[in-house]
UniProtKB/Swiss-Prot annotation:
<feature type="binding site">
    <location>
        <position position="69"/>
    </location>
    <ligand>
        <name>Zn(2+) 1</name>
    </ligand>
</feature>
<protein>
    <recommendedName>
        <fullName>Uncharacterized dipeptidase C3A11.10c</fullName>
        <ecNumber>3.4.13.19</ecNumber>
    </recommendedName>
</protein>
<keyword id="KW-0479">Metal-binding</keyword>
<keyword id="KW-0645">Protease</keyword>
<keyword id="KW-0224">Dipeptidase</keyword>
<keyword id="KW-0031">Aminopeptidase</keyword>
<feature type="binding site">
    <location>
        <position position="271"/>
    </location>
    <ligand>
        <name>Zn(2+) 2</name>
    </ligand>
</feature>
<feature type="binding site">
    <location>
        <position position="181"/>
    </location>
    <ligand>
        <name>Zn(2+) 2</name>
    </ligand>
</feature>
<feature type="signal peptide">
    <location>
        <begin position="1"/>
        <end position="39"/>
    </location>
</feature>
<keyword id="KW-0482">Metalloprotease</keyword>
<keyword id="KW-0862">Zinc</keyword>
<dbReference type="GO" id="GO:0046872">
    <property type="term" value="F:metal ion binding"/>
</dbReference>
<feature type="binding site">
    <location>
        <position position="181"/>
    </location>
    <ligand>
        <name>Zn(2+) 1</name>
    </ligand>
</feature>
<dbReference type="Pfam" id="PF01244">
    <property type="entry name" value="Peptidase_M19"/>
</dbReference>
<dbReference type="GO" id="GO:0006508">
    <property type="term" value="P:proteolysis"/>
</dbReference>
<dbReference type="GO" id="GO:0070573">
    <property type="term" value="F:metallodipeptidase activity"/>
</dbReference>
<dbReference type="GO" id="GO:0005794">
    <property type="term" value="C:Golgi apparatus"/>
</dbReference>
Length: 409
């Protein structure tokens, strides 16, 4: 038996060191969450209805969406002048009020810039002069995301590493990450890629709707590189070194496979759906889904009706569920699925998923299909956080010098 004289009781919180107090507060909060869950289970008459499952998951685990185009919406409609508007209520598909209704806990904001028009006097499949302008515009889009967090500090929290998401969630903040959507935005320069990373960009889509010097686009591309160019292989390895996520959405199947051959990180698609459900070039083929499983990666399912259904006008929330179920069937689990709605970058929406407030309805639908709380939590955000952390850890383990060539094409 341990005597009272030898039993070391914890000091009152106000007498503990700051770091110890912080750790204790986190532990107490975790304990409260566990007790809350036990309380749910302990009520003899409690029934886990689909609605209760969905609510439990979305209030205990951060929902992280892989792709939202609010920044370009703000540019095109308001010239990025945030002081002239309120982000609480906007006429598009995303605003603070509806993000809260949708229980969004984290968002990868796309700092998208359109592909430059090709030079009719050049035989190249890219326009380097136009790409230089895209670099400038990308910096402006990064800035607008940072100003979102500056002007709404109780809502948005700039987040540059995966471990911060859980703490943002506990503070009721929406983790705000950034991704560039096409390597035309770096104008052939790995140094620009590195500077974007230092500014907070955490994924880069290899191509948008145009080929670039690195990779081929699935839509409006010309198969210029027949997948990845030699420079593209180098840039994928540089992204691995940085700990930046390699995003394969928008790319051709050849590009997907070749990138997975080169990359040491898990496969990642920020906003793509299943080609096995609808044969659209923006979707992921089944043979690539197998590789997603092999690399322990994730496909963030897109909601755009034109990508998910041969009859876009008839697309519904159930259409999105079918894509999710197909990916689960091919990969053998729900471990490789996330959500990348593409809101404010799409001109039509599925019935039942009209805006960012509708995520709870999607989780109810998934719960009705028999998904467990663990599986729902995986789809909500645990899968993408796993992929992100693995990518970060691999970056820390790569001890190579930065890629030093500049625009050598």
């Amino acid at each position: 038996m341990v005597s009272d004289s030898k039993l070391e009781l914890p000091l009152p919180v106000n007498q503990q060191k700051p770091r110890r107090r912080r750790i204790l507060k986190v532990h107490l909060l975790i304990a409260a969450l566990i007790l809350s869950a036990v309380g749910y289970l302990g009520k003899g008459k409690w029934i886990w209805t689909p609605e209760r499952k969905a609510h439990f998951v979305l209030t205990h685990f951060p929902l992280i969406d892989g792709h939202n185009d609010l920044p370009i919406y703000l540019r095109e409609n308001y010239d990025n002048r945030l002081l002239n508007i309120s982000l609480e209520h906007l006429p598009g598909q995303t605003d603070i009020f509806r993000l809260r209704q949708g229980h969004v806990g984290g968002q990868f904001w796309s700092v998208f810039v359109e592909c430059p028009s090709l030079d009719s006097n050049s035989s190249l499949s890219w326009n380097r002069t136009g790409e230089y302008e895209a670099v400038t515009q990308t910096l402006q889009q990064i800035d607008v995301v940072k100003r979102m967090a500056l002007y709404y500090p109780k809502t948005f929290s700039l987040t540059d590493h995966s471990g911060k998401v859980k703490f943002d969630f506990l503070r009721n903040h929406i983790s705000s990450m950034m991704g560039i959507e096409g390597l035309h935005q770096i104008a052939g320069s790995p140094s620009i890629l590195r500077q974007f990373y230092d500014l907070g960009v955490r994924y880069a889509t290899l191509a948008h709707n145009c080929d670039n010097v690195f990779a081929d686009a699935a839509v409006d591309g010309k198969r210029t590189n027949k997948g990845l160019s030699p420079a593209g292989r180098d840039i994928v390895r540089e992204m691995n070194r940085l700990g930046m996520i390699v995003d394969l959405s928008h790319t051709t199947p050849e590009t997907m496979h070749q990138a997975l051959d080169v990359s040491v990180a898990p496969a990642f698609f920020s906003h793509s759906s299943a080609k096995g459900v609808y044969d659209h070039p923006r979707n992921v083929p089944d043979d690539v889904l197998i590789r997603v499983k092999e690399t322990d990666g994730v496909v963030m399912v897109n909601f755009y009706p034109a990508f998910i259904s041969p009859h876009p006008e008839n697309a519904t929330i159930d259409t999105v569920v079918e894509h999710i179920m197909h990916i689960a069937n091919v990969t053998g689990s729900y471990r490789h699925i996330g959500l990348g709605g593409d809101f404010d970058g799409i001109d039509m929406v599925p019935k039942g998923l009209e805006d960012v407030s509708k995520y709870p309805d999607l989780f109810v639908k998934l719960a009705e299909r028999g998904l467990s709380i663990t599986e729902l939590a995986d789809i909500a955000g645990r899968n993408v956080l796993r992929v992100w952390k693995t990518t970060e850890d691999l970056g820390h383990s790569i001890h190579e010098p930065p890629l030093e060539w500049e625009d050598d094409f």
